[in-house]
Amino acid sequence: QHQTIYTFSECFLTILPLHLNLPLQQYLQHTLFNNLNDEMITTITTLFSHNGNMSSAAKELHIHRNTLLYRTQRYFEETSLDLKRSDDLLIAYLAAQLNKLTKYP
């Protein structure tokens, strides 16, 4: 049997959204979840994993950098979160993680 072992730092941001207080979870759900389709969740998580680097994230997503910029601009227009800013990217990432953790099949 092969078991995967994760360190605290590897899973902290994945489980953190479940430990946010209820009003903050509701804010994330009502304000940001409405704008999170599967494509946008993948975009946000990939951008986050590349520390906001648009070129390398676009390469991993197999899209043109301008397409990624268009997606981030569209997301900004819908949520006022600028994914080029690390603090806004973190908020969007936490919302994406909470969405994945609470989504029912």
Regions flagged by a language model, labelled:
Residues 1-105:
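Cytosolic nucleotide-utilizing catalytic cores of signal-transduction proteins
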